[in-house]
Amino acid sequence: MYAPIIKLSEIKNFLSSNSLVAQKKFGQNFLIDQNIVRYIAECSKDFFEKENVELAEIGIGLGTLTYPILEFERPTYLFEIDRAYIELAKTTYLNLFPKAVLYEGDALENLHHIFSKEVFIFGNLPYHLTSEILTIIATEFKNWRGGVFMVQKEFAERVTGEISSLSIFLEGMGKIEFLKKVNKKCFYPVPKIDSALIRILPRPKEERLFHSKEDIAVWSRLLRTFFWGKRKQIQVSLRDSPFSQDPKFQEAVRKAWEKTNISPTSRPEELNRKQFLTLGQELLDLLS
């Protein structure tokens, strides 16, 4: 089954007849390539189809991806802020799927409803909220089973390939994979840059770096300290960063890099992901 508004002509007609324009502040660029829609569904189903896992979608828009998600006939939690698309969902397809629950308003204020759910998440994420949403998922969702997200291609390359504060932070929770570049012409209105699909799968609980709010705070503090001066030696950042001005924390970090054979003259970009995770685990052990 396809969404009621899927062709480019249908989208333009819907927007025009309702005196609507795509809202840049909400990151509204509507996916119009059905090959990509099918790809998202196909590359995700193995992670929830055989188990009792629920689904969620952040930003349903015109329902292009929502329809195939709802056809899995799982309890599904939908998040949408724009009144026009909330009303579209209510008047066209929500009544066909009794297992769907729609949360109206800002997703950042509503995601708490599913923090404890065993859920697989989909989302076409606005650029200005991408990091915040992924951080919330990494730190607040206790039982989530993974997610596939549409993000800007530059962000996808950075979070999957580069050594950055966010990529290493998320690595402590799960595995991040670059799935597919999505050409900007697959959207309407056509954005200025290409997008990409990433998949994040959480590590088994026993392998996750952080297990409590306190762990998260320590891990975040370590990364903020080191990446405060990305091209500085980590010993310099530890000494000078505003995030590390605590003798107990500084001493624990020094002991941690000694035990993990990481040189204090290293720069963050010279360390690999495994070294960061090993260092983080040692630091958490020392401070526990």
Residue ranges and their predicted role:
Residues V190, K213-I262:
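Long, well-ordered amphipathic alpha-helical subdomains in the mid-to-C-terminal portions
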Residues M1-R221, T225, E269, T278-Q281, ...:
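Catalytic cores of RNA-modifying enzymes
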Residues L55-L65, K230, W257-E258, S263-S266, ...:
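Extended, compositionally biased low-complexity polar/Lys-Gly-rich tracts
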Residues D246-S288:
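Conserved Class I S-adenosyl-L-methionine
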